[in-house]
Amino acid sequence: MKCFDISDWQDYFTSVDDFKKAKDQGYDVVIVKLGESYNETECCRTQILNAISAGLKVGIYYFSHAYDLETCGYEANWVISKLSEIGLTPWHLQAGIWYDYEDHTRLRSHINNGNLTYQGITNIMCDFVNRLNNAGWPFVGIYSGYSLLWNETYMYSQVPWVPIWCAQYNSTCDYPDVYMWQYSDQGDVCGHSMDVSEVYKAPWLEEPPKKKCDCGCSCCSK
């Protein structure tokens, strides 16, 4: 199953027609950036609802800047609140919620200084998943690069049941039992270069949650 992900860098890709063309090209799933640093991605609401209307399965991701459990809690609460504000339910987000915890300069500084241990990273990842699960979101996972996931966390050894979306730009994905593998940042989506992934395990797509929404939006009223 083919997937692509979009953010504010793809603010040109928002219409129902855009997503219908992606579906015609063979893409079944899209993951939309919800936000970062407690700021909502400007075009995410339009992208989410129009992708659903076009018949794609939709998920969201939140880019993390959490380096301790307290900040992780703030981020989780922000995501929960924002999803409620938008009026989204598990029925809308059948491709899940993903905590984007990837390597960058500030994170690397915390690791190198000893302020953030491998166990600390693992605890943060698990805390976000647990908080969202407890808030009624059953399909929550972690997105990150292979090197960080495998070499600097204990996700596979301690919590192998947590869904993993692994980025590794290679001919194969070396992380075991991934749910999704982001294999390129230069995939063709309707003539645009985007991040693309392969979906391997998606029980939520096979047995989607029952529709429980009376918000009146176009995608729910069909």
Regions found by a protein language model. Give the residues of each.
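Short catalytic/ligand-binding loop motif for oxyanion handling, primarily in non-cytosolic enzymes
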Residues: 106-108, 149-152
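Aromatic-lined carbohydrate-recognition surfaces of secreted/lumenal glycan-active proteins
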Residues: 135-151
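Short beta-strand/turn micro-motifs composed of small residues
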Residues: 62, 144, 168
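Glycine-rich, charge-decorated loop segments at or immediately adjacent to ligand/cofactor-binding or catalytic sites
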Residues: 71-74, 150-157
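Hydrophobic anchor at the start of a short beta-strand
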Residues: 58, 138-140, 164
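Accessory recognition modules or surfaces
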Residues: 28-29, 148-149, 162-164
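Substrate-binding cleft of extracellular glycoside hydrolase catalytic domains
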Residues: 1-129, 133-135
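Functionally critical loop-and-helix segments that line ligand-binding/catalytic clefts
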Residues: 1-8, 16, 155-222
